Each structure stands twice: as C-alpha cells, then as structure tokens.
From Swiss-Prot:
Record domain Methyl-accepting transducer: where: 352-588
Originating species: Pseudomonas putida (strain ATCC 47054 / DSM 6125 / CFBP 8728 / NCIMB 11950 / KT2440)
Family: Belongs to the methyl-accepting chemotaxis (MCP) protein family.
Phenotype of the disrupted gene, per the record: Deletion of the gene causes significant reduction in GABA chemotaxis and reduces root colonization.
Residue ranges annotated for the Cache domain, each copy included: 36-254
Entry GO MF terms: transmembrane signaling receptor activity
Protein known as: Methyl-accepting chemotaxis protein McpG
Length: 624
C-alpha cells in the first residue's frame, strides 16, 4: 500500500475493498443460487410440460388404437361385412382414411379413393409390419397416397387369413399439440423416435431428418437431463420426455428452449444486483468516511500538537486533553507522559548547560590567572638564574683570592679585607637566593594547589558531561520509541550526546595535562626545597668565612690553612651553584611546559564554553 496515503485513507480504502469484496461475493453467490434455481425450475417446468404433452399424445392415440383394434376384431368375426364396418362414423370422423389390406392382394379404403393400377398392399411396409405384429402398431409418418398428406398409420392384424386393417391419422392434431408448446416464446417442441429421427417439427424441412442434422456439433442424448447445444449460433437447452403406452413406438417429446431467453431474468437480476451493490458501496463508503473522520479526530489533535512541538515554538508545556479511554485515549496519555519526560529532561539539560557554562568561565578565569602567575614565576626564575650566575662568579673569585692568598701572604690583610667584602656580598647574594628560592617554592606550591583546583573543576565538568550524555541517551531512546513523531527529538538528543561526549574527551585531555603539570610542580617543589637546603648550607659556610675573615688580622699565621678551607668551601659552593643553576633551568623548562598546558587548558575551556553555548541555544529552542 502506498506510504504517502494517510492512515484514515488506508482504513477507508481497506474497508471499501472489504465491502466491495463482500458485496461481490454476495452478488456472485446470489447469481449462483438464482442460476441454479432458474435451471431447476426450468428442468421441472420442461419435465412437467414433457410429461403433460406425452400424456396428451398418448391419449390422442389410445382411443384411436382401440377403434382400430375393435375394427380388426369385428372384421375377423364378419369378414363379409368388412367394408360396412370400415364405414362407421366413429372411424370416418377419427381417421383421415380407413383401409384393409387383404392376404389375396385386395385393398379396400374408406372413404373411397382410386388407387394406382397394380397397387398391392402386401408389398407395402405397413402391411408387413401389421402382419408381423402381435397387436396394434404405429407406423412412422409417411405421405398417404390417397390424400397426399403426412399421416401416421395405426395398424392391427385381423387374422392370417384376412389381412391387416389400419387407419391413417393426420398429423395436424399431433402437430397442433406439439406446436402449442412455445414456452412463452422461449422455444419449441418436436417429436423424435428412439433412432433420433425427427417425426414432427415446427420447421417442416427438418421432418424425417436426424438429430445429428439439426445439431451437428453436439448431438444430444435422448435423456431427461438438460443439455446445452449450439444451433444456428444460439445456445439451446434440450431435454427429452418419453411417450409411454404406445405399442411398438419408442417416441420422445423433444423440448428446446433458448438459453439466453430462459435466463433473461438472471441478467435482469445481475443488473439490479450490480446497481444495488454500487449504490450500497457508495453509501457505506460515505458513512465509513464520516465515521472514520469522527473517530480519527483525537489523532488529528495529537498530530497537530506534535507538529507544533517539532516545527513550531517547541512548547513542551502543552498537554493533550483526554476525553476517552479507548486506544486514542491510551495513546494520548502516553504522549502526555512522553512530553512530560522530555520536558523534565530538557529542564535538567538547560540547568546542566548553565552549570557547564559557569564552570567553563571559572576554569578560563583560573587558567588566565595561572598564566599570569606562570609568567611571574618565569621572570623570577630568570632572576634567580642571574643571581646564581653571579654567585658562581663570586665563588670563582673567592677561589682566585684564596690562591693569591697562598702566594701573597704579605698582602694577607688587604686580601682579608677584600675577602671580607666578597663574603659579605656572598652572604647578601645567598640571602637573596634563599629568599628567591622560598618565593619560587611558594609560587610552585600555589601553582600545585591551582592545578588541584583545576582537576576538581574538570571532575565536575566530566560528571556533568556524563550526566548530559546519559540524559541525551535517554532522550534518544524515548524518541526512538516514538517513531516518526520523535525524529526531531532524536536529532536534538544525538547532538546533545555528541556535545557531551566531546566535552568529556576535552575534560579528560585537560585532566591529563593538569596531572602532568602537578607532577612537574611537585618535582619543582622538591628541587626548590633541596636548593633551599643547599642555600642555607652556603649561608652557613659564608658566615663561617666571615667569622674567619674577622679574625684574619689576629690569625695571620693561619692564613694558609684558612685559605685551603676557603678554597675547598669555594669549590663546594661552585658545585652547589652549578647544581642550583641546572635546577633553575629545569624549573624554567617545567614552567614553560606548564604555560603551554595552561594555554591548552584555556583553549579546551573556550571550546567547552562554545559547545555549552550551542547546547544552550538548542535547549532554548524549547519552551520549558
């Protein structure tokens, strides 16, 4: 069935086909019954007419056979008065001619008639049949020589010594009886013997011809069954009724009717039935159309509501008014529950979208702040690196001075004073270095805590995106259950689920980057703590050097030993400075990586904000 047809039209079409089929079957069944009834009535009618005609013909011949038999008996008793007996009024009025064929070849006839010269009855077939018969017998129709008319002879043997007496019966009466049967203009009757020869027929040209000449294509059998035959382009129904009680004559009354005329009533009935069927089908289809329109009204209301949600303002606050508890009422309740569930889901998605947007803004703000702190940390790290370089240069200078002190003992005081100044500068540099290391450690700790906060925020984003994904999946499932009507919801739900999935992936990437930043920050904190410890050691050594330089004037004799100690301490200080320099460079690299990670986080948060805005726009298309 065409998919573009409306459901009500499909119902109406199916109902129309059922009604048409039912009426067609009813008409065909009635046609079958009417045909059988007409055929049965026709068979009964023809059988009755055949039996009645057979009785009339038998009655026609029985009386005359009695007359001939009585005449034969009377002549046998009184052969001398044969001609007188043949002239009785009863015989003259009943027969066309009465005659006597004698065994000596003589022939008497009443009324008198001149026979051909040399006429010998003994050579005639009727004489031979009469002499051979044990009782009265009938001849087939033949032309009487005296009257030149078609007659049937009734013969009876007088005796073997006298001859045969007979009476010719004109066929006019028999023809009148047979031709009187026209069955209301539908057909005719005819007389035929058991050999199929036609004895009497309305068409005189067919008399004495066989049935095969009349019906060459299909010669009917002489039975009482109704047989269809073709004759002159017409279909005719034939039946035969035997004429019983006639001596030596096996005759049948053939009844022939035109099939089209016989079943003309059936054609009229068919036309009336077709007209009635068409009128009834039109009326029923019209009533069905009105009934379907009334019954489908709740569905039309539901369709308009769904179209308003799908193509209009997306108003999810509308509900259907249920007025019945039938299938449409159940469907309406289901639709209201579905819209209520979608309404709740859209509200939750809207709220979650606002939260995601706020979280994204907070993450962006935190990322910008972290970027600023990272820049500050980078600047200070560069300052620490410069100070470390100065500290290294100072240590090298101390080593040179210590070597010169060993070589130039004479200028120990001057060198001690210079060493005192260098130590003071060293102490000041160490103090600055210690302060910078403490500050860097605090900044890195702050960065670490910020990354922890960012990780918590990302966990919130991940949880929200997972909830959004579940809500979108539930909405898609409910839309799939709604079929074609929920296709718009399915598209929106699928878009929301994709956005949530992308948000979750971005949050996971940011989480991974932040975890790497946290690891780097923890390593930087450990390194700065170690650097601070080394710085404190250097400060202690520098203080010791200062104390020793304070007493250099009174302990000049110990300059060589002290210079060795200073050289050793200076070498250690140089190693520590180099280590600190390496740590500072590594901190700087980690800080750069942190900046790059923060930039990636910022970009991801910007994408998250855009997707949240898009989701908010989609949710805003519904009225909640």
């Amino acid at each position: 069935m065409n998919k573009s047809l409306r459901f009500s039209h499909k119902i109406l079409l199916a109902a129309s086909l059922i009604v048409i089929l039912a009426f067609s079957l009813f008409t065909l069944y009635n046609d079958y019954l009417q045909r059988n009834a007409i055929r049965e009535d026709l068979e009964n009618y023809l059988a009755e007419m055949g039996a009645s005609t057979s009785t009339n013909i038998r009655n026609l011949f029985e009386g005359r056979i009695k007359l001939v038999e009585n005449l034969a008996q009377n002549i046998a008793q009184d052969p001398a008065n044969a001609e007188t007996l043949m002239g009785q009024n009863a015989l003259i009025s009943s027969f066309l001619t009465v005659y006597l064929g004698k065994v000596d070849g003589g022939f008497s006839v009443r009324p008198d008639a001149k026979m051909p010269d040399g006429y010998d009855p003994r050579t005639r077939p009727w004489y031979k049949d009469g002499m051979n018969a044990s009782g009265a017998t009938l001849t087939e129709p033949y032309i009487d020589m005296t009257t030149n008319k078609m007659v049937i002879g009734i013969l009876s043997k007088v005796s073997s010594s006298v001859g045969v007496v007979g009476g010719d019966l004109a066929l006019d009466g028999l023809v009148q009886i047979i031709n009187s049967l026209n069955f209301g203009g539908m057909g005719y009757a005819f007389l035929v013997n058991d050999q199929g020869k036609i004895l009497v027929h309305p068409d005189k040209d067919l008399v004495m011809k066989s049935l095969s000449d009349l019906f060459p294509q299909h010669t009917p059998k002489l039975t009482g069954e109704l047989t269809e035959v073709q004759s002159d382009g017409q279909t005719r129904l034939l039946t035969f009724s035997p004429i019983t009680g006639l001596p030596s004559a096996n005759w049948y009354i053939g009844l022939s009717v035109d099939k089209d005329k016989a079943f003309s009533m059936l054609s009229t009935f068919r036309t009336s039935a077709v007209i009635a069927t068409v009128v009834a089908v039109v009326i029923i289809i019209g009533l069905l159309g009105l009934l379907i329109r009334v019954l489908m009204q709740p569905l039309h209301t539901m369709t308009r509501a769904m179209e308003d949600i799908a193509e209009g303002e997306g108003d999810l606050t509308k509900r259907l008014h249920i007025h019945s508890h039938d299938e449409f009422g159940v469907l309406g309740n289901a639709f209201n529950r579905f819209v209520e569930r979608i309404h709740s889901s859209i509200r939750e998605v809207s709220s979650a979208t606002e939260q995601v947007n706020e979280v994204a803004l907070r993450v962006i703000s935190a990322s910008n702040s972290s970027m600023t702190n990272s820049d500050e940390q980078s600047n200070r790290t560069n300052s620490v690196a410069a100070a470390i370089n100065e500290l290294g240069a100072a240590a090298q200078e101390i080593a040179g001075n210590a070597a010169q002190a060993s070589q130039h003992a004479s200028s120990a005081r001057l060198l001690a004073e210079e060493g005192q100044q260098v130590v003071e500068r060293n102490i000041a540099a160490m103090n600055r270095l210690s302060d910078l290391i403490v500050t860097s450690s605090a900044h890195i700790e702050t960065l670490n805590s910020k990354t922890v906060n960012i990780g918590q925020i990302l966990e919130v984003i991940t949880s929200i995106s997972q909830q959004t994904n579940l809500l979108a999946l539930n909405a898609a499932i409910e839309a799939a259950r709604a079929g074609e009507a929920g296709r718009g919801f399915a598209v929106v739900a699928d878009e929301v689920r994709n956005l949530a999935h992308r948000t979750q992936e971005s949050a996971q990437q940011v989480q991974t980057m932040i975890e790497e930043l946290q690891v780097g920050a923890r390593e930087s904190v450990d390194t700065m703590e170690q650097s601070q410890r080394h710085s404190q050691d250097s400060m202690q050594i520098a203080n010791q050097a200062g104390e020793r330089l304070d007493s250099v004037t009174v302990r000049i004799g110990e300059i060589d030993g002290m210079n060795q100690s200073v050289a050793t301490a200076t070498e250690e200080q140089t190693a520590v400075v180099e280590a600190i320099n390496m740590d500072i460079n590594e901190i700087n690299m980690l800080n750069q990586e942190g900046v790059e990670n923060l930039q990636a986080t910022l970009r991801a948060c910007s994408d998250l904000e855009q997707q949240a805005g898009r989701l908010k726009h989609l949710v805003g298309s519904f009225r909640i």
